Amino acid sequence: MAPVPVSVSATLAPPPAAPPKTTSRSWERRAPADAAFAAASSVAGSAALLTLTPAAPAAALSKEDVAGSLTKAVDTVSQAIDVGGKAAEQVAAVLKALGEAVKPALPVLKSASDEALKLAAPVVSAASKQATEALQGAGVDPAPVLSVAKTAAEQSTKVIDAAKPVASAAVETITSLGPEDYVVAAGXAFLAYLLVPPVWSLVSSSLRGYKGDLTPAQALDKVTTQGYVLIDVRSEKDKAKAGLPQLPSNAKNKLVSVPLEDLPSKLKGMVRNAKKAEAEIAALKISYLKKIGKGSNVIIMDSYSDVAKTVAKTLDSVGFKNCWVMAGGFSGRKGWAQSRLGTDSYNLSVVEVVTPSRVIPAVAGRRTGTTAARIGTASSASRATTRKLLPGGVD
């Protein structure tokens, strides 16, 4: 008899109660509670994934399901710990929730993780102590698995270098598995996050195709304090309607606009995926900007964070390994505008713009030529001009 599909939603635990609302307008104060709630929700989903019976995965899961669930879990937990949630009680609560998620799957985890932990033993980080305590606090005895691993107090760079071959092997293994092995892979990788964060960081990045997702608040912090470059790939129409991110004066030069190409109707009918093609063309233009290099930290922002992922993946594939995506984009439910971080009017703002190329005809009302322009209060007339400029020209 064919295996009966198991509904993921049927295995979900009741969602935790929402954290109490705060009247503070400071995103730094709200972030830990919001992130912890997101982490708890993600953990519930991961628990559902891990508690599927071995007979079910062939019908219930795909490679995309596994990669998506794992990266979502790690991203939300990382937010809880990194965005203002460094207090000991915050970390302990998140790790205990993770322990509860792993608990039902331990029989599956052990057989899948023994060899992985032997390879990862030299790179077990100090975080394993917190993970161990959290598992024990949740009533899980991790001793049989942890006995394989040995603590290593090494510098972070050495840990990451040592983790690379393990992560590479893990990615190859996960992508080559058959459907019947997906749950085992999911469980092993999830436990690897608890015990060996450097390995999981590299694995999740490879599965995702780009560095990771940042909340709007995280993106603002990275741009203003660490020099990250924020690249807005929205169309001029979308920017005029929704506005631009409001940045401090010392960070305004970190915002660059590279609108997606608007392929002509005839050309759209000739390509397999016009939306993807437009995003990949924008990524190639970004890769040639003088402002950024392959070692630069870049955050891609679109309207709802869907197209931005394609842009980030394309940049990663050509050597830009530090590409992030702003979760929710500018206009999404958890995007910049909804995060109340400040919005500037497009007509009154100053942002460096790379306009569409001459190879692809511009739509009506848009300039031709690949140019860098300064958009300001006096720029509306210049945007309406029909002058053709050579590539790289500046007006």
UniProtKB/Swiss-Prot annotation:
Stretches with biased composition (Low complexity): 1-12
Membrane topology designation: Single-pass membrane protein
Keyword tags: Chloroplast, Membrane, Phosphoprotein, Plastid, Receptor, Thylakoid, Transit peptide, Transmembrane, Transmembrane helix
CDD domains: RHOD
Domain Rhodanese, first and last residues per copy: 224-345
Compartments where located: Plastid, Chloroplast thylakoid membrane
Modified positions (Phosphothreonine) in chain numbering: 377
InterPro entries: CAS_plant, Rhodanese-like_dom, Rhodanese-like_dom_sf
BP-aspect Gene Ontology terms: cellular response to calcium ion; de-etiolation; regulation of stomatal closure
Keyword Transmembrane helix: yes
Membrane-side (Stromal) residue stretches: 204-395
Post-translational modification as stated in the protein's UniProt record: Phosphorylated in both bundle sheath and mesophyll cells, under both low and high light regimes (70 vs 900 umol photons/m-2/s).
Residues in the Lumenal, thylakoid compartment per record: 40-182
GO cellular component, one term: chloroplast thylakoid membrane
Presequence positions on this chain: 1-39
Disordered, as annotated region: 1-27
Transmembrane segments: 183-203
Protein role: Modulates cytoplasmic Ca(2+) concentration and is crucial for proper stomatal regulation in response to elevated levels of external Ca(2+). May function by regulating concentrations of inositol 1,4,5-trisphosphate (IP3), which in turn triggers release of Ca(2+) from internal stores. May play a role in de-etiolation.
Full protein name: Calcium sensing receptor, chloroplastic
Species whose genome carries this gene: Zea mays (Maize)
